A protein has these predicted regions:
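Short, surface-exposed amphipathic charged segments that create phosphate/polyanion-binding patches used
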Residues: 333-337
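Carbohydrate-binding surfaces of carbohydrate-active enzymes
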Residues: 363-376
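Active-site mouth of glycoside hydrolases
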Residues: 29-262, 268, 273-274, 286, ...
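Bacterial N-terminal signal peptides that target proteins for export
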Residues: 2-13
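The feature captures the conserved acid-bearing segment of alpha/beta-hydrolase catalytic domains
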Residues: 276-284
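Bacterial N-terminal signal peptides
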Residues: 11-24
Length: 376
């Protein structure tokens, strides 16, 4: 009787371990190089912009029901289509999902329908560590005169980020959104976290947790696991944006996680074309498709004229920052946080392609974009 009891104990203990491990066993695995490259071979060369409708100051104003502006979205995506763009990088927000998950997912579906009419497949961003660390639902404040991206908010905010007891909220959001659209061919990819360890040194540094990097090192792998548990047919990524990428050994710890967890690689580069190409070549050592999900800062040396031909040569996806100069005011340089452009405008636009009426900032630029994309 004692032997039988012990056997039963071992059986139940083994079953318990299996049940605990089951979610991980059932979760989708990291894509192999072959799968990632096979997927990319079937895609047209991705070229587009980071998109926020000109009537929104941030992600919350874009997606909340009261300010969701389909007319502007349709009009501005039409301008993007007209110059050959076929993707947009679009930021979501966990607070909007928590407020009304079904309503938010319906608005995402509406956005996807509009984008599809313009032959655009977006990359959706779930979390973002840049700018204001205290997002609040409701009416958003007006743009601060003369200041670049004066209303953009982080997702999640500091209050959630530094409290692990609230992480189940983030897990529900990731699994909810990715799960709802896991099989949607209108979506190109999921960018799980934008610049995760950005400390916002020149803007909101005092509002960020002092141990932000440590927090993100523990949280980002969980976010990848949550997204994989939803079994998306689209690839997952999180973009490298600083550090030495010569090898995994020289990379910051967070960058290693991004490389090792991403199905396709992505990165940001706002520097000269020589630097852009150098970073492309460094990432090619990992033998996976590459997207540049942020570039084009004219005053810093990153331009359509010089970067797009390099991206096309290496078949690296190219997604510049900014489409239409609107409430985000990203045509203003980063240094506007120290010196607002109130009484004068910058000598050259920092980001963005179109004026509010659809007129290109530089006609030659849109001709270059159209020329490069027409030769896909």
């Amino acid at each position: 009787m004692k032997l039988t009891f012990c056997k039963c104990c071992r059986w139940f203990f083994g079953l318990a371990l299996l049940l605990v491990a089951m979610p991980n066993l059932l979760a989708q695995q990291h894509w192999s190089e072959a799968r990632a490259n096979g997927w990319y071979a079937q895609q047209p060369w991705p070229v587009g912009a980071n998109f926020l409708p000109s009537t929104a100051i941030n992600q919350l104003e874009m997606w909340q029901a009261e300010s969701f502006d389909t007319a502007t979205i349709d009009r501005e995506l039409g301008w993007a289509e007209g110059i050959g763009m076929n993707t947009m990088r679009v930021f979501l927000h966990n607070l909007v999902w928590e407020q009304d998950a079904k309503g938010f997912e319906h608005r995402i579906d509406v956005f996807l329908a509009i984008a599809a009419r313009h032959h655009i497949r977006p990359v959706f961003v779930l979390f973002d560590s840049c700018w204001d660390p205290h997002p609040k639902l409701g009416v958003q404040h007006s743009p601060i005169p003369g200041v670049h991206n004066s209303g953009w908010v982080q997702a999640p905010g500091t209050e959630i980020l530094q409290d692990p007891a609230q992480y189940p909220r983030l897990e529900r959001y990731v699994k909810g959104v990715v799960g709802t659209f896991a099989n949607d061919p209108r979506i190109l990819a999921w960018d799980l976290w934008n610049e995760p360890d950005n400390g916002n040194a020149d803007s909101y540094a005092k509002g960020d947790p002092k141990n932000k990097n440590e927090i993100i090192l523990g949280l980002l792998p969980q976010v990848f696991a949550w997204a994989r548990a939803a079994h998306p047919t689209q690839p997952l990524t999180s973009g490298l944006w600083h550090g030495d990428w010569s090898s995994l050994a020289t990379m910051p710890a967070l960058a290693r996680i991004q490389v090792e967890q991403s199905d396709i690689l992505s990165f940001h580069n706002y520097s000269w074309p020589e630097d852009f190409e150098q970073h492309v070549k460094l990432l090619q050592q990992f033998h996976r498709p590459i997207l540049c999900t942020e570039y084009m800062a004219r005053g810093a040396g990153s331009t359509f004229d010089t970067v797009l031909p390099i991206a096309r040569k290496h078949r690296v996806g190219a997604i510049n920052w900014g489409l239409v100069a609107g409430k985000s005011q990203t045509w203003l340089p980063w240094d506007s946080w120290q010196h607002p452009y109130v009484n004068e405008q910058p000598s050259v636009w920092h980001h963005d392609v179109f004026h509010l009426d659809g007129t290109p900032y530089r006609q030659r630029e849109v001709e270059i974009i159209r020329s490069q994309t027409s030769a896909r």
